[in-house]
């Protein structure tokens, strides 16, 4: 291991050595020992609030920031009272905005005919529209809305990013995602988005970053069968075998070979929404979703041809709690889902 790495792992220690130990002239022995300070590369980087605030003041500042974030979020709860942009009806071919949600985990769910389904719970936390980009400034074909999800501390955000949020009147967000929308589905920046944006029975597409597995061989990465375990095989049990032929004298692009596995954005299409909890903003989607627990995922209306026109019965362009729609119950279920409040056995 190199010497500098050993010193870095040792932390901020004081090393003393004489001038003779440094290979200097013997006449310099009478000088005082030279001190070396090694900065620990693994230590937490300090910021202004780490250095200049006491523990008592630090807790006060964090509480003050938390209260300010709650005030900003509360001020955005009634977007229809803040002169919203004109609302337009749904038309065939319209594209709505999507949501950013937190993956909570999985649980079972039963239908009325007794079938068991595994569902993934996705919670919408402080999801807001941040920016509108007209199609002239985006790609010339379709407009875009930038959506931010999950409020985070402003202590680690640069001033340029904080200024953007100050103009919006919102706390900083952990992640931003871009959604393509048609002109009739444009929403004013600062509008909050809720889980009721989606309704039970519809189908959605979920995008997230898969769990990273590191560098893996072809058997784990691509599911290769491998080679025989005996009968003359020497150190080739898990190898891929031939990767090309001699006549072409090259390896074709896209050949399945060992490499890094996972840690890539993947989309699962056509997941059915079984249940929506409007109190805690939780969406129950069918099956598994890429990513680990507590990761942020991107949800939008399914683009599969079979479900592309299923948005006509959904809130358009999004759900407004202060709109003309009646107050929603705490739980919305698909018509085929058995509700926990119902009896499990009925007699005719």
Swiss-Prot record:
Localization of this protein: Mitochondrion
Keyword S-adenosyl-L-methionine: no
UniProt keyword Cell cycle present: no
Keywords: Mitochondrion, Ribonucleoprotein, Ribosomal protein, Transit peptide
Family: Belongs to the universal ribosomal protein uL3 family.
NCBIfam families (alphabetical): L3_bact
Protein name: Large ribosomal subunit protein uL3m
Organism: Mus musculus
């Amino acid at each position: 291991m190199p010497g500098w790495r050993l010193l870095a792992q040792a932390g901020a220690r004081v090393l003393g050595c004489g001038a003779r130990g440094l290979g200097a002239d013997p006449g310099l022995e009478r000088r005082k020992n030279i001190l070396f300070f090694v900065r620990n590369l693994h230590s937490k980087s300090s910021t202004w609030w780490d250095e200049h605030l006491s523990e008592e003041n630090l807790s006060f500042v964090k509480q003050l920031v938390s209260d300010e974030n709650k005030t900003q979020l509360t001020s955005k709860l009634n977007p229809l009272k803040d002169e919203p942009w004109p609302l337009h009806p749904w038309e065939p071919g319209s594209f709505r905005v999507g949501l950013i949600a937190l993956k909570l985990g999985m649980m079972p769910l039963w239908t009325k005919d007794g079938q068991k389904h595994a569902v993934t719970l996705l919670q919408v936390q402080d999801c807001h529209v941040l920016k509108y980009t007209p199609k002239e400034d985006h790609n010339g074909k379709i407009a875009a809305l930038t959506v931010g999800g999950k409020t985070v501390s402003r202590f680690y955000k640069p001033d340029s990013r904080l200024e953007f949020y100050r103009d919006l009147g919102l706390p900083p967000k952990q992640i931003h995602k871009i959604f393509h929308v048609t002109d009739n589905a444009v929403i004013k920046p600062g509008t909050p988005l809720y889980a009721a944006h989606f309704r039970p029975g519809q189908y959605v597409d979920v995008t997230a970053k898969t769990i990273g597995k590191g560098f893996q061989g072809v058997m784990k990465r691509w599911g290769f069968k491998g080679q025989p375990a005996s009968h003359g095989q020497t150190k080739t049990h898990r190898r891929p075998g031939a990767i090309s032929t001699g006549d072409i004298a090259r390896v074709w692009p896209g050949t399945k070979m060992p490499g890094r596995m996972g840690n890539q954005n993947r989309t699962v299409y056509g997941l059915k929404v079984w249940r929506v909890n409007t109190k805690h903003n939780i969406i129950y989607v069918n099956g598994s979703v890429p990513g680990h627990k507590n990761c942020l995922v991107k949800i939008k209306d399914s683009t599969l041809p079979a479900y592309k026109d299923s948005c006509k019965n959904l809130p358009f362009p999004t759900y407004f709690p202060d709109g003309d729609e009646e107050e929603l119950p705490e739980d919305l279920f698909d018509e085929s889902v058995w509700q926990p409040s119902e009896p499990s056995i009925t007699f005719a």
